[in-house]
């Protein structure tokens, strides 16, 4: 089972990663949070939106979907990435770069599987 790991940044803010059962990071917070409570709210937003539809921006003439959604895209280095956007359009999570689009899609599926029931662990400073 996956888990959300909340940690404190060097500047005293908070961030989170969603890790799969194997310990691999499958989603990182797209921002840092000024308080632990606001970071936990970010985690809850990921949970709530973890089974959203996928807007495949790697396809020419892709159909724009409503929020919440995962946006699948190709970065400047040619790797496939995704970001999770909440109902209000705010970016709440982002992925690492994947060489293969299929791997990125597997990452999205893993979020849908892991996030809803994932434990939340707050790392000690």
Language-model features: where?
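A structural feature that tracks compact, well-ordered secondary-structure segments
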Residues: 3-7, 13-33, 42-45, 69-75, ...
């Amino acid at each position: 089972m996956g888990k959300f790991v909340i940690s404190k940044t060097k500047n005293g803010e908070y961030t989170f990663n969603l890790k799969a059962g194997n310990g691999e990071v499958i989603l990182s917070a797209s921002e840092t949070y000024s308080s632990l409570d606001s970071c936990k709210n970010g985690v809850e937003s990921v949970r709530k939106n973890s089974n959203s539809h996928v807007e495949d921006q790697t396809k020419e003439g892709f159909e724009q979907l409503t929020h919440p959604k995962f946006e699948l895209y190709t970065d400047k280095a040619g790797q496939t990435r995704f970001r999770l956007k909440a109902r209000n359009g705010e970016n709440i999570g982002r992925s690492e770069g994947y060489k293969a689009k299929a791997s990125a899609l597997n990452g999205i599926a893993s979020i849908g599987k892991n996030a809803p029931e994932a434990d939340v662990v707050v790392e000690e400073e």
